[in-house]
Amino acid sequence: MEPDPKKIKLDIFNFPTARETRTPEEVAESYAEAVKSHPFYDNVHSVIDFYDSGTIKDGRGQIIGVVLREALPKYAVSMASELLASAAVRTSLRSMMFGGESPLSGIAGYFDYRGSPVELKSRKTSFTYEHEAAWPAVFPVVDYVSELYRHVAPERWKAQNDAIPDVVRIHGTPFSTLTINSRFRTASHTDVGDFDGGYSCIACLDGHFKGLALAFDDFGINVLMQPRDVMIFDSHHFHSNTEVELSFSGEDWKRLTCVFYYRAALGEPASYAEYQRRLEKSKQDNSFTPVVSNVRVKENGTNLNRPSPVYPICPSPFWVPMVAHCLQHCASEAQCVHDAMTADGSRLAEVMFGEPLSTSDGIPLRGEDKKLKANSDSASRPLSRLGGFSETNLMVSTAVEKKKYLNSEFLSHFISAQLLDMWKQARGKWLELVGREWTHMLALNPERKDFLWKNQSEMNSAFFDLCEVGKQVMLGLLGKEVALPKEEQAFWTMYAVHLNAACAEELHMPHVAMSLRKLNVKLKDFNFGGTRYFKDMPPEEQKRRMERKQRIEEARRHGMSSGAHEKRANWLTNDSFDYQTEDCVVDYAQHKWPPPALHAKEITKNVRTGELPTREGVVRVLVVLPDPQSKLECVDCKLEVPETVRCSCEWERLMSSLAVRRVLAAAQRNLQLPGSVTHGNIEIRFAFHSRLPTDMCDFVVLQHVLSCIPDDVLASAYIRRAAALCTGCVYVVETDVQCRQYYTLKCAARCDYDAVASLFFQQLHRVSYGTKAARVRTKGELESLIPTVCCARYKLQGSPLNTTVHVVSPAPSR
């Protein structure tokens, strides 16, 4: 189906104006108002980061969600993401879930439009209507998600499948609607309007990012999701996203997710009345044969749109094997330890991990004045205003959304074939010359990150030629001879973002190499100062350029006179009975794709949703301590701290914790090997890290052992040695040198912390374990050591050593 030219042209040049840009005071007020009802939850607010496939239940054994890693075929997510990426547009409708800003979000499939000013209700979304010919690209991913849902929650799937009206199914599944989110960190919310008797499904379709976990706010659990992951969950529990984890300001990232659900209002009487009205109307048109010949009314259940009741869990690191599918072989043993560890008055956590699960007077958190706004990286990185277009945050982020309009497949609908061919040739020529020069620069310096623009080069001339074509493309899109200043601003911003992306994606250059700033300066030369080069050119070059400019203008005018493209009736006024006209059969066998049912059976073969069996025998735990390198019972930390560090505000904040002071005043923990401990049917033995026993156990706990192994290769090998001693899993207990708020901090606060953190934790390790130069690692560094599968990360709350426990499967990596 061809796009609506008028609508597309309006969207191309629909950029924010100065009047639309709010003042900082207005933005702050809007943010404060939004987070009152929809607060953001950072990683620091949670206890568990869950990395693997698993079944997560509440305190009464009710399923919160089932997460499946790499559950979708690559081709299915690729096909769907290519189409659905354009469905996520700026919308104020969900701004309360984004700190008062308009996120990139959209809907597809069918929608009821109840409460919307749209006159015609209960029908296809505008996106599906306008992309009907391309819509089948989503069918494989919808089919695969539906079958995964059916295999892990058959009763919920059946209830939803029985209730959904057949006329609004997406490809025969129990889903009526898709919500597509791009670069959207959601604040805490429940999904209003979903069918109460079923579940929602979320899939990550595309992206490169860290963080942005799906957080279940009332349970302190984060589920990390990457492309191809799926989660089937109760969306009536409050959920949100944690912060994006950027190593530096302006780091590039993207994330595209899709939520699959049944919009319950589509099964209410008002919607059925609309379906029937349209059907009766269609019967009066002898030239129209509807795909669906009748409307079967179904029982829709009671949909109250209320949050699900919360039955909290009492977590511990031993809760993870009770959840993770790859650790179900040791789930019963883990439950024995978990129950004992979380019992009132239990000190098992201190015995195994060196400190309790929670400390009330740990290192104090920073105030909001030290933190970034939770939606601060929603748009592209901030840029200064310079040259040919506005580099403001809002203008550039809008251009990122619209750069697709300069792709050839879009332009082919709106400009003449002759002008399109000129555009493709000029664009290709410039990229070829840029690529040639970049290759030469890398040959001289392989570490080079910046592109050196030579004003007298062939590449520079090719850029001006491309700008000449681009200017006529702009006028062709506008359908007039002169562009308004705001239209020029919009186009050249989009043009620069398009070329920046082309250099990165097609030439594999760093984004900073052909930066927007560099392109902006050259556009300023073209638009405002480029003519100064013209008078210095040889007469033959001046003539060539004038003739070329005339040819480009003629090509553009030819496109304007060739007549408008045929377009479909406007979606707003579409009153036809066009339900299911977009449907078609997917021939999985012809494409050699696995049938969704067989694929789901394989993916879910290890899923466990029932109760755990009871363990009767002895559960054996080995706790490994660092060798005692020092016999000192107490170390004066002040002796080794430079004055500049000791007087810093960050050092004072860290040292202000009563829990930290207790650690500094306590005796070294590993001066001698503790005797074995028996707690019910749990037997705990201890060993120093250089003298591992050879007999097998159920679980191995490495208590700050890796901090005394500075070499990463040796540290990774040690984890493998420990894994060979257990039938269950390994618990890697270590300091995370990055504080729990690290990725939410402003740059200055992060720098202040980085300046003192390593020395601070080394002091605590020296006191606690006698490790004189502890290798304290970041979360990423710790996880890179794990040679098998890291199932989860447990964060000891308020820990003065910022201790985390990584739960590691002994099985090889998938």
From Swiss-Prot:
- Please give the chief subcellular localization of this protein: nucleus
> What's an example Gene Ontology biological process for this entry?
DNA repair
Site annotated as Involved in J base recognition, conferring specificity towards J-DNA: where? 525
Which positions bind 2-oxoglutarate? 255
* InterPro entries tied to this protein: 2OGFeDO_JBP1/TET_oxygenase_dom, DB_JBP1, DB_JBP1_sf
Region annotation Thymine dioxygenase: residue ranges?
62-264
Location in the cell reads: Nucleus
Q: Cite the EC number.
A: 1.14.11.6
Q: List positions binding Fe cation.
A: 189, 191, 239
Give cofactor(s), names only. Answer: Fe(2+)
Instruction: Spell out the Pfam families in the cross-references.
Output: DB_JBP1, Tet_JBP
Ranges for the region named DNA-binding JBP1 domain are: 392-561
Going by the UniProt record, its keywords in alphabetical order are: Dioxygenase, DNA-binding, Iron, Metal-binding, Nucleus, Oxidoreductase
The record describes how the cofactor is bound as: Binds 1 Fe(2+) ion per subunit.
Reaction catalyzed = thymine + 2-oxoglutarate + O2 = 5-hydroxymethyluracil + succinate + CO2
What do the Gene Ontology cellular component annotations say?
nucleus
Molecular function terms from GO: DNA binding; DNA translocase activity; ferrous iron binding; thymine dioxygenase activity
Output the superkingdom of the source species: Eukaryota
Q: How does it associate, per the subunit comment?
A: Monomer. Binds to DNA as a monomer.
Family from the record: Belongs to the TET family. JBP1 subfamily.
This chain's function reads: Dioxygenase that catalyzes the first step of DNA base J (beta-d-glucosyl-HOMedU) biosynthesis by converting thymine to 5-hydroxymethyluracil (HOMedU). DNA base J is a hypermodified thymidine residue found in the genome of kinetoplastid parasites, which is localized primarily to repetitive DNA, namely the telomeres, and is implicated in the regulation of antigenic variation. Also specifically binds to base J-containing DNA (J-DNA).
Q: What is known of its domains?
A: The DNA-binding JBP1 domain (DB-JBP1) is necessary and sufficient for binding to J-DNA.
Q: What is this protein called?
A: Thymine dioxygenase JBP1
What organism is the protein native to? Leishmania major
